[in-house]
């Protein structure tokens, strides 16, 4: 079991401080297999190590004295189906001191997930690129289709203004059908949709936290009027690493094939090299990597990710 290390020196304040953590379902929600959908509930272990100038060390570890709640804005979430977010349930200051957590529950000490704790050497996933949409059409009354102009992996960041309780739904797809609606049959049982409920306080900005999608097109519903292209940005998410290689030739077809490979490879770096970023699979199959790993190494500095996975 890998753990992350962070230097939080610059975030410490004089006086009292607070530690706040948000847990998503992650890989506890499984690939679609008969009879197995959830392996466990989200859990975490954490400790803050404080080193004083006089050499003293203090460790503050997670235990049953910590407080928890499931009443925050993030609802249903997993990487296959998307995320539901109700902005009306936001708790300003929940991860700062002071904050009234008297209605929160006490944390429970639970069993370890198994395995041995060891430091993760590779860097985490982050926003590595952005994509501006190129078009928006109305495929049916109140149904808008956003075209990112590029098949990408990540999520959609949006700016929106409306009334409290307005419910916006975003459905993601790689292709369109002949009638202009999104094609989702290739996703199989993955819903690949995000839901955002407005709090109604002027302009709101949002992107999900615990999901990602493989898509070019986004179906938008629940909007009071046709949204603007400037309201959206595609954020490309994959494991942070350097791009170390490139290929450019005099043949546009070869260049396009290379770019397709480039986008496809980095879109499948999700804490491990996966087989696909859109349907109900997204697994780290050995066969896929046996074929592609050598070629990938000429483009990306990916050795730490592969070391973690293997």
Which ranges hold each PLM region?
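Extracellular/oxidizing-compartment recognition motifs
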Residues: 1-279, 287-288, 304-309
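Well-ordered alpha-helical scaffold segments within catalytic/enzyme domains
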Residues: 223, 291-302
């Amino acid at each position: 079991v890998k753990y992350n290390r962070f230097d939080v020196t610059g975030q410490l304040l004089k006086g009292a401080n607070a530690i706040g953590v948000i847990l998503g379902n992650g890989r506890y929600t499984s690939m679609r297999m008969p009879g197995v959908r959830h392996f466990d509930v989200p859990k975490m272990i954490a400790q803050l190590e404080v080193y004083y100038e006089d050499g003293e060390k203090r460790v503050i570890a997670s235990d049953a004295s910590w407080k928890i709640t499931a009443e925050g804005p993030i609802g249903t979430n997993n990487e296959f189906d998307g995320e539901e977010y109700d902005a009306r349930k936001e708790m300003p200051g929940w991860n700062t001191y002071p904050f009234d957590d008297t209605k929160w529950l006490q944390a429970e000490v639970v069993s370890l997930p198994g395995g041995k704790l060891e430091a993760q050497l590779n860097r985490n996933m982050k926003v590595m690129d952005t994509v501006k949409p190129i078009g928006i059409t109305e495929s049916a009354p109140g149904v808008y289709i956003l075209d990112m102009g590029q098949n990408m992996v990540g999520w959609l960041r949006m700016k929106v203004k409306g009334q409290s309780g307005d419910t916006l739904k975003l459905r993601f797809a790689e292709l369109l059908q002949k009638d202009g609606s999104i094609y989702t049959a290739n996703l199989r049982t993955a819903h690949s949709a995000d839901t955002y409920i407005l709090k109604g306080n002027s302009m709101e900005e949002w992107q999900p936290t615990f999901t990602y999608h493989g898509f070019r097109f986004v179906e938008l519903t629940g909007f009071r009027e046709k949204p603007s292209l400037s309201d959206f940005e595609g954020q490309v998410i994959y494991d942070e690493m350097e791009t170390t290689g490139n290929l450019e030739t005099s043949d546009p077809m070869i260049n396009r094939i290379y770019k397709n490979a480039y986008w496809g490879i980095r879109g499948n770096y999700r804490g491990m090299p996966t087989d696909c970023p859109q349907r109900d699979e997204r697994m780290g199959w050995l066969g896929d990597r046996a074929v592609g790993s050598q070629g990938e190494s000429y483009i990306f500095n990916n050795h730490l990710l592969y070391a973690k996975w293997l």
